[in-house]
Amino acid sequence: MKNTLNNELAVCGFAAVKTLEKANWERITRLYFSSARAPLFGGLCKKLAAAKKPYNQVKDEVELERLCGSVHHQGVVAMIQTPEIKALNTEITAKWVEEKQSAILLDRIGNANNLGAIVRSAAFFGIKNVVIPLDEAQSSVTTSSYRVAEGGMEFVNIYSIKSIPRLLNDMAGKMVRIGTSLDAKETTRSIKQMCQDKGVIIILGNEENGISKEVKSLCDHLVLIPYAGFPDAKPVIDSLNVAQASSVIMYELMGK
């Protein structure tokens, strides 16, 4: 939940706030917690006091719900300045190419929880770059995505772009562009072989419609996740949730 008056974003959830404390406590502008959580944030309160930043043990957890707009606060809410999503530029992508870094590109992922889960998986598998389009259908960083990321937001860079096709065109021959599709002929098991000793851009599509036809046409490879009995059997469910699928794909990409 955003506080537009103060340009703040509420970060809630124990793991998210604890990781924020360990990695970037200076970003916290205000802290609120329940009596049950108070013993776990004594050290942070001392730091905030030294920095002359307010903190408060609330009398009623309803106040935490009001601050973050959710009942899923887990007894703590930290306010931070609303994160600025940095625009992706050629200097950054040139570094990706040089260092053979990989990135996750989201094609209109509309659910904030899915964005958070994807960021969590990216952090777990050591992928530091997530790219989102400036599109009304694309979820941005919210209180919900922060909570679901379970601290992953502190370890992943999120960039914005105006045009997915333009980025994919710019990366042609420089990075391997791998999209996901239910009608793909290749599977995620071959991703390591597709890398060609280059960085990889994994494109994940919208929850309902997948990646667009134009984006598919700009991919070097299209892959799907093989199910039990592949290719002879058909699964009871056609596909995984996009966040679940992202974890499988990242495992195949980063696994030894």
Language-model regions, residue ranges each:
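RNA substrate-binding interface of SAM-dependent RNA methyltransferases
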Residues: 15, 19, 26, 33, ...
